[in-house]
Regions:
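Active-site metal-binding core of divalent-cation-utilizing nuclease and nuclease-like domains
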Residues: 1-30, 36-40
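A generic secondary-structure signal
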Residues: 18-21, 50, 79
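Core beta-strand-centered patch of the WYL/Sm-like small regulatory domain
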Residues: 28-30, 35-36, 40-51, 60
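Non-catalytic C-terminal interaction segments of nucleic acid-processing enzymes
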Residues: 42-46, 56-59, 63-145
């Protein structure tokens, strides 16, 4: 799923959630990153780029220690990687979700937003990933969330 080499050890997610295939849904693999401190732009971009283009992940969720940190990471992705990615060009707005829930004020999965800063429901997002094959996923299909 991750397709990372040994030298990419520091680029592995904090944990990986796999929702098994059922009769009505596909297997869904979502990586989670928990960020408590600011990393360099170069390191963040390298990590996000590898998740986007070198893995078979269905999605990635960044849970950050503050709203400022999650916004910084979101803008790095939106401005630097999203416009260039061939693999993510149709679903890129919703491949990464971001949260500042470590900052307090709600459940971790109640405060998720996509690369454009729009609220996204974790349950609906996972449901969409499970019910829609990769080549058919489109960000515009998620506007009802």
């Amino acid at each position: 799923i991750l397709n990372l080499s040994y030298v990419d050890y520091d680029l592995r997610p904090d944990f990986l959630l796999t929702i098994q295939k059922t009769e009505s849904s596909n297997t869904v693999c979502v990586a989670f990153e928990i960020e408590r401190s600011r990393k360099s732009d170069e390191r963040i971009l390298r990590k996000l780029g590898k998740y986007m283009d070198r893995t078979q992940l269905d999605g990635l969720i960044y849970i950050c220690d503050s709203g400022r940190l999650s916004e910084t990471i979101r803008l790095l992705y939106q401005n630097n990687l999203l416009p260039k990615s061939e693999k993510q060009k149709r679903f890129g707005e919703n491949f990464f979700l971001f949260s500042d829930s470590l900052d307090g004020g709600g459940e971790a999965f109640d405060r998720l937003f996509n690369a454009c800063g729009k609220f996204t429901s974790f349950k609906n997002w996972c449901g969409y990933l499970g019910s829609t094959e990769w080549p058919k996923r489109r960000s515009e299909d998620l506007k009802i969330w």
